[in-house]
Amino acid sequence: MPEQAIVIAMAVSFLITVVLSPLFIPFLRRLKFGQSIREEGPKSHQKKSGTPTMGGIMILLAIVATTLWITPKIAGLSTRTYLLLLVTVGYGVLGFLDDMIKVVMKRNLGLTSRQKFIGQLLIAAIFFAVYRQSGFSTVLHIPGADWSVDLGWAYGVLLLFMLVGGSNAVNLTDGLDGLLAGTAAIAFGAYAVLAWNQGQYDVAVFCVAVVGAVLGFLVFNAHPAKVFMGDTGSLALGGAIAAVAVLTKLELLLVIIGGVFVIETLSVIIQVASFKTTGRRVFRMSPLHHHYELVGWSEWRIVVTFWAVGLLFAMLGIYIEVWM
């Protein structure tokens, strides 16, 4: 039964990360793969320096293993499944390279912005080439409205923007213990519901595999974090959520379901634009979660608040698509 497979997929993915983490975290410590904290960041973060990073490897292993095991049992391994894994693993590898450079150089710098952008663009281009070759629709639907437009090859521009922008937006959100793991679980959970509602059980299995993986990771990433996912995890999750939005044809709904990621990104854009044009900063620090830190909020209060906002956005997205 598909319903049982969904529950099993989430449970298996959760258990993989929960079982692997106690083994993998000490291994990262022995390798001295600790997070370096940027000097211009909040002073309270300096005590986190040296916390093992690259925990996203465990998330990736759980997602890939669960998807490849459970999906054939209810829907078969489709092109959609392979596309999702292509983006997830591809962006994960890119993040891994970024993290490796950081831990080897012992400073909070990895790939250059240009190198990272080229890598993101290349993976997105491969995704679109396979997507187009496989005959998937290039029609863009307006959520909650009976209106759509066929973008043709221009859809590729939208797709590239979503994958590159999505991975960067999610990456920006990964700044506090448990913040990204929780908001990602909520966003992927919403898309799991919508994919299931469409009968795309393969996509639904992938989504719940992500939910299980990040919730299992959250056990060790909640404040005070014993491990960080690093760019290995954040870039992979960002690319994956964008790919899910594309394959479910709910591209525009990502702005709502991923509302927390959008707000975090906008806070950075507003901060930079304001400083360059007026010499003044709108926020004490960006992304937005750092602003609330400097205002005096506790880390746990910020994280739980952002989770709550993310849940509201997710429910709004489901309401728009299913009931409107």
Swiss-Prot record:
Membrane topology: Multi-pass membrane protein
Enzyme Commission code(s) on record: 2.7.8.13
Ranges in a coiled coil: none
Record pathway: Cell wall biogenesis; peptidoglycan biosynthesis
GO CC list: plasma membrane
Enzyme class: transferase
One Pfam family hit: MraY_sig1
Catalysis performed (reactions): UDP-N-acetyl-alpha-D-muramoyl-L-alanyl-gamma-D-glutamyl-meso-2,6-diaminopimeloyl-D-alanyl-D-alanine + di-trans,octa-cis-undecaprenyl phosphate = di-trans,octa-cis-undecaprenyl diphospho-N-acetyl-alpha-D-muramoyl-L-alanyl-D-glutamyl-meso-2,6-diaminopimeloyl-D-alanyl-D-alanine + UMP
Swiss-Prot/TrEMBL cofactor(s): Mg(2+)
Nucleotide-binding keyword on record: no
Main location: membrane
MF annotations from Gene Ontology: metal ion binding; phospho-N-acetylmuramoyl-pentapeptide-transferase activity; UDP-N-acetylmuramoyl-L-alanyl-D-glutamyl-meso-2,6-diaminopimelyl-D-alanyl-D-alanine:undecaprenyl-phosphate transferase activity
Cystine pairs: none
Keyword DNA damage appears in the UniProt entry: no
Compartments, record wording: Cell membrane
Function: Catalyzes the initial step of the lipid cycle reactions in the biosynthesis of the cell wall peptidoglycan: transfers peptidoglycan precursor phospho-MurNAc-pentapeptide from UDP-MurNAc-pentapeptide onto the lipid carrier undecaprenyl phosphate, yielding undecaprenyl-pyrophosphoryl-MurNAc-pentapeptide, known as lipid I.
Descriptive protein name: Phospho-N-acetylmuramoyl-pentapeptide-transferase
Lineage of source species: Bacteria, Bacillati, Bacillota, Bacilli, Bacillales
Protein's gene: mraY
